[in-house]
Curated annotation (Swiss-Prot):
Belongs to the nucleoside phosphorylase PpnP family. Pfam families: Ppnp (PF06865). It comes from Shewanella sp. (strain MR-7). Its EC number is 2.4.2.1, 2.4.2.2. GO terms for cellular component: cytosol. Catalyzes the phosphorolysis of diverse nucleosides, yielding D-ribose 1-phosphate and the respective free bases. Can use uridine, adenosine, guanosine, cytidine, thymidine, inosine and xanthosine as substrates. Also catalyzes the reverse reactions. It comes from the Bacteria. Keywords: Glycosyltransferase, Transferase. InterPro entries: Ppnp, RmlC-like_jellyroll, RmlC_Cupin_sf. One of its GO terms (molecular function) is thymidine phosphorylase activity. This is Pyrimidine/purine nucleoside phosphorylase. It catalyses: a purine D-ribonucleoside + phosphate = a purine nucleobase + alpha-D-ribose 1-phosphate; adenosine + phosphate = alpha-D-ribose 1-phosphate + adenine; cytidine + phosphate = cytosine + alpha-D-ribose 1-phosphate; guanosine + phosphate = alpha-D-ribose 1-phosphate + guanine.
Length: 103
């Protein structure tokens, strides 16, 4: 199991899509932040307010990136990058997890 050490974690979860997506914010001493999330099976659309790197930490997602018409599969250990102010879709058929780093 990979650990994130010496951080502060928000007690309250970020809940989206009627509880089907949940994440926790993790704050580092240098002021940076990540979110660790769990996604139940479904299809969801998200928007970014800043650049992000999404790393799949368990399971897999199909992702429809901005300006794309083709779904791409990202499995555990893979990642994709998003710029600020775009929308993208993810779908999954089993529970999956992610770590989002903000740029």
């Amino acid at each position: 199991m990979e650990l994130i050490e010496q951080v502060s974690v928000a007690k309250k979860a970020n809940i989206y899509f009627e509880g089907k997506v949940a994440s926790r914010s993790v704050f580092f001493s240098d002021g940076s932040k990540q979110t660790l999330g769990v996604v139940l099976p479904g299809e969801y659309e998200f928007s970014t307010s800043q650049g992000e790197i999404m790393q799949v930490t368990s399971g897999s997602f199909e992702v429809l990136l901005p300006d794309s018409t083709t779904w791409q599969t990202f499995s555990e250990g893979s990642q994709f990058e998003l710029v600020a102010n775009v929308s993208f879709k993810i779908r999954n058929s089993a529970i999956a997890e992610y770590c989002c780093s903000y740029l």
